Swiss-Prot record:
Protein name in the entry: Steroid 17-alpha-hydroxylase/17,20 lyase
Catalytic activity: a C21-steroid + reduced [NADPH--hemoprotein reductase] + O2 = a 17alpha-hydroxy-C21-steroid + oxidized [NADPH--hemoprotein reductase] + H2O + H(+); progesterone + reduced [NADPH--hemoprotein reductase] + O2 = 17alpha-hydroxyprogesterone + oxidized [NADPH--hemoprotein reductase] + H2O + H(+); pregnenolone + reduced [NADPH--hemoprotein reductase] + O2 = 17alpha-hydroxypregnenolone + oxidized [NADPH--hemoprotein reductase] + H2O + H(+); 17alpha-hydroxyprogesterone + reduced [NADPH--hemoprotein reductase] + O2 = androst-4-ene-3,17-dione + acetate + oxidized [NADPH--hemoprotein reductase] + H2O + 2 H(+)
Keywords of this entry: Endoplasmic reticulum, Heme, Iron, Lipid metabolism, Lyase, Membrane, Metal-binding, Microsome, Monooxygenase, Oxidoreductase, Steroidogenesis
Gene: CYP17A1
Entry cofactors: heme
Protein species of origin: Bos taurus (Bovine)
One GO BP: hormone biosynthetic process
């Protein structure tokens, strides 16, 4: 027994002991590190990690490293270095590390978001972008789809008769239906049990990802039971069962003459690969049902929670700044009025609303730390050596809260995105990357920006958003997972009197 224990400990020591680096190379300054546990004892344990990493810059500078188990992670907290990683050397840092919980979520790095660099990731990212291109014009135009769901949402809110409600569920339904239309060309009904199941799955996944899972740091612990891993497996299984039912129906009824959604594009690519009508990068094995499910799962996971969360953050900040809300509504009244629906072309005229959206994305970034990248070759950042296989994380929170780049970064100031006249949108700093950049940038950025503008302009056109009668304002602290979520809150929603009067006049013979 003692011999087995000794062998086990020696094996651990070999696996987790810091490896020798290249002789003479200059590396990022590192936190202290111990055998087996790495820098874990020296990392702050309390508070939000993105803020803790930002705080460590005071001692270690805008680029530093630490070890978790056997892995070295480099943390980036300056826009110039971040742009080098994401843009200038985007291909060199386009890998994704293997992480136990994310491996389950992505079915061993399938899909787009968590897939490692390679033919599979490149193919599925290209196909997803092709799907979004379907929705540029005509009956499938993205703007039309978003406005349909925004109208359904507003009609529901009008039935609440001024009650204070949590926007999470109706917002999630609206955004889920937009994603569903892009993926499958159909929408869920409010009472559909599949919709509730999808929402529960997303909540469960985010709950697991919001916790520190030791197995992510020490893969050797996989021999022991883990409640977090079991929960993740259950969520992914439920999600795949729901999506697989849709996939099989779509495959049965598929016609190459009618390509109208992401699933059609994936199936057509599979047909082409099977018939040898595709390029060498479209291997049929990369388009199995499991690969398709992972990609659809990524689009649902990333597309629903992110947009829903940002809209709630915008509403929360408007509740804290009622005079700003009033100014935005005045702009909407003067520029759009009440007889037509806001359109994307209004974005350059409703500049205060657009500046408010951009400021929310700055002060409360969707992903305060971007999904980790991985060096796929030996490379460098600045004059520092980065070995192949090193994880690299961009701390978006640090970029968006740097006092060197932003005046009073902790204050909510939409005017920072406007010129001195307040009539033109500007880009005040390069230290602003709400959707990432480069080869790993968010594939749904265009969709998200349109959703945020159209939903908020429609809501503010029709409703007054007020603090509930109990006077309780939403907390602006947030809860970090892959997505920076706002804590649950309620908002009192009343149909604007000016809207009522305009509708009454419009219905008069």
């Amino acid at each position: 027994m003692w011999l087995l224990l000794a062998v086990f400990l020696l094996t651990l020591a070999y696996l987790f002991w810091p490896k020798t680096k290249h002789s003479g190379a200059k590396y990022p300054r590192s936190l202290p590190s111990l055998p087996l546990v790495g820098s874990l004892p020296f990392l702050p344990r309390r508070g939000q990690q993105h803020k803790n990493f930002f705080k460590l810059q005071e001692k270690y500078g805008p680029i530093y490293s630490f070890r978790l188990g056997s892995k070295t992670t480099v943390m980036i907290g300056h826009h110039q270095l971040a742009r080098e990683v994401l843009l200038k050397k985007g291909k060199e840092f386009s890998g994704r590390p293997k992480v136990a919980t994310l491996d389950i979520l992505s079915d061993n790095q399938k899909g787009i978001a968590f897939a490692d660099h390679g033919a599979h990731w490149q193919l599925h990212r290209k196909l997803a972008l092709n799907a979004f291109a379907l929705f540029k014009d005509g009956n499938l135009k993205l703007e039309k789809i978003i406005n349909q769901e925004a109208n359904v949402l507003c009609d529901f809110l009008a039935t609440q008769h001024g009650e204070a409600i949590d926007l999470s569920e109706p917002l999630s339904l609206a955004v889920t239906n937009i994603i569903s239309f892009i993926c499958f060309n159909f929408s869920f009904k409010n009472e559909d049990p599949a919709l509730k199941a999808i929402q529960n799955v997303n909540d469960g996944i985010l709950e697991v990802l919001s916790k520190e899972v030791l197995l992510d740091i020490f893969p050797v612990l996989k021999i022991f039971p883990s409640k977090a891993m079991e929960k993740m497996k259950g969520c992914v299984q439920t999600r795949n069962e729901l999506l697989n039912e849709i996939l099989e129906k779509c495959q049965e009824n598929f016609s190459s003459d009618s390509i109208t959604n992401l699933l059609h594009i994936l199936i057509q690519a599979k047909v082409n690969a099977d018939n040898n009508n595709a390029g060498p990068d479209q291997d049929s094995k990369l388009l199995s049902n499991r690969h398709m499910l992972a990609t659809i799962g990524d689009i649902f996971g990333a597309g629903v929670e992110t947009t829903t969360s940002v809209i709630k953050w915008i509403v929360a900040y408007l509740l804290h700044h009622p005079s700003l809300k009033k100014r935005i509504q005045d702009d909407i009244d003067q520029i759009i009025g009440f007889n037509r629906t806001p359109t994307i072309s209004d974005r350059n005229r409703l500049v205060l609303l657009e500046a408010t959206i951009r400021e929310v994305l700055r002060i409360r970034p969707v992903a305060p730390t971007l999904i980790p990248h991985k060096a796929v070759i030996d490379s460098s950042i600045g004059d520092l050596t980065i070995d192949k296989g090193t994880d690299v994380v961009v701390n978006l929170w640090a970029l968006h809260h740097s006092e060197k780049e932003w005046q009073h970064p902790d204050l909510f100031m939409p005017e920072r995105f406007l010129d001195p006249t307040g009539t033109q949108l500007i880009s005040p700093s390069l230290s602003y990357l709400p959707f990432g950049a480069g080869p790993r940038s968010c594939v749904g950025e265009m969709l998200a920006r349109q959703e945020l503008f159209l939903f908020m302009s429609r809501l503010l056109q029709r409703f007054n958003l007020e603090i509930p009668d109990d006077g309780k304002l939403p907390s602006l602290e947030g809860h970090a997972s892959l997505v920076l979520q706002i804590k649950p809150f309620k908002v009192k929603i009343e149909v604007r009197q000016a809207w009522k009067e305009a509708q009454a006049e419009g219905s008069t013979p």
